[in-house]
Amino acid sequence: MFLSIYNFFYNLLKDYFIKKYKSELLESAEQFKKFDKVTFKEVEIHRLAVPLQMKFKEQNEIISKFGCYFLCILFVGFVVKEIKNNVEKCFDCFEIDLLFKGLVSKGCLRGDNAFVNSPNAIFANLGIDEDIYFDEKHYPSSYVPLESDILIAKYKDESSSFYHFVIVANDRKTVIWDSLGNSKAVSNGYIDSLRVFKIQNKAIVQRVKNRLELYNAKFRNNLEVA
């Protein structure tokens, strides 16, 4: 008698809770269905690959004083590397300092004034020497670049005879990236000569160019905010 009453109420309660929780689960599922209708857009956030020169004052005084050409070469190299490997990496001052010291130890550049002995040796250490190379000569400002060329311009400040390197577009007028932000050598000077870097991997030429344009816009926006 007791067992039959127990079984009756047990089954009754079991049916009740099954219906209750099944209903709650269905309601939850309906809520998630609503979220399924929402489309989320993936937004790419591209940060400039190399810090500005003045940010190295505490980390590496040599880079902060003399590192404009070295940083331009790294900037170009990192853009080629991220396009080639489809991996974006923003390097901080600490990482650049370690890389600088490693490249000095291998003879790629001098540690006392950041003079670059071999851009191609730097590219080899970055693993991109088959993708881009430096044409070992100085070109005049009148040089007409190929589509696959990346230009680093050597500017001379007329008022101080100070030299400074920046990355420029193929029109030789647009500054893509300036390690000093807005350097006086660019605003008060002229292009003394050009360093020409040639992309050998034809499959990445357009993507590298597009990424440099994007970084140029990012660079300009950062200057406006500052």
Predicted features by range, described:
Residues 1, 223-226:
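Short intrinsically disordered terminal tails
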Residues 1-108:
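Active-site-adjacent structural segments surrounding the nucleophilic cysteine of cysteine proteases
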Residues 37, 42-44, 195, 207, ...:
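Detector for intrinsically disordered, low-structure N-terminal pre-sequences
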